[in-house]
Amino acid sequence: MFYQLNNNMTNKPTIAAIIPAAGVGSRMQHNAPKQYIKLAGKTILEHTLTKLSALAQLNTIVVALNENDPYFEQLPVIDARIVRTCGGKERADSVLNSLLFLAANPPDWVLVHDAARPLVTIDDINTLINECISADEGGILASKVKDTIKRGHIYAEQTVPRDDLWQALTPQFFKYEDLKNALQNALASGAVITDEASAIEWANKPVKLIPGRSDNIKITTPEDLDLAGFLLQKQQNENAL
């Protein structure tokens, strides 16, 4: 599909969003992939796309889908900036495919967000973008670990100090070239890449930790879907005040 980033001939950095959405979400025990499960009358992916579409600073929003995805084209058109490309076997493959899709007219920065995190707030995303651009460094939304963490298998073997532990959230925001090069090289080396930050860390580049709201949950299990419904209603009530 042809598209063109719109930088309006200004000095503002161009930003593209990437949503890896090629997974099947087997833990949801549902016929459709989890991003197409309904939450308060809309699919999870619709909620996520609607949230990102509220960000005027995004030039394009790339959704990486399974090649045989039959659901996406059935969704209502939310924003003309949304385009699709083919995802890969793993999340990192989908993100790299999206980066290569953008290569003909690359943005300055990319914002990668989980399809199954529809509860992220606009305020958190703007804080992430502004702090990273101001520092000229990539970063991620993250939440300080509050629970006691144990290491073990069947039995607890060790309590892990949590003073410097953070739970990585999304979006994750990095310079386009930094992330593309880091992912390409890390995957070629056989490194296990679980999120974009892990690729940047592998490349020995800094990753800023930007505190984000703990209700920015990833919907992975049926229990998460119930919790997301409650949290969505709570957010809507907050916004109505």
From Swiss-Prot:
Family listed: Belongs to the IspD/TarI cytidylyltransferase family. IspD subfamily.
Originating species: Pseudoalteromonas translucida (strain TAC 125)
TM annotation in the entry: none
GO biological process, any: isopentenyl diphosphate biosynthetic process, methylerythritol 4-phosphate pathway
Keywords noted in UniProt: Isoprene biosynthesis, Nucleotidyltransferase, Transferase
UniProt entry tagged with the keyword Transferase: yes
Enzymatic class: transferase
UniProt pathway: Isoprenoid biosynthesis; isopentenyl diphosphate biosynthesis via DXP pathway; isopentenyl diphosphate from 1-deoxy-D-xylulose 5-phosphate: step 2/6
Pfam families xref list: IspD
PANTHER family on file: 2-C-METHYL-D-ERYTHRITOL 4-PHOSPHATE CYTIDYLYLTRANSFERASE, CHLOROPLASTIC (PTHR32125:SF4)
Reaction(s) the record says it catalyses: 2-C-methyl-D-erythritol 4-phosphate + CTP + H(+) = 4-CDP-2-C-methyl-D-erythritol + diphosphate
E.C. no: 2.7.7.60
Listed GO MF terms: 2-C-methyl-D-erythritol 4-phosphate cytidylyltransferase activity
Site keyed Positions MEP for the nucleophilic attack: positions: R162, K218
Protein's recorded name: 2-C-methyl-D-erythritol 4-phosphate cytidylyltransferase
Entry function: Catalyzes the formation of 4-diphosphocytidyl-2-C-methyl-D-erythritol from CTP and 2-C-methyl-D-erythritol 4-phosphate (MEP).
Site (Transition state stabilizer): R27, K34
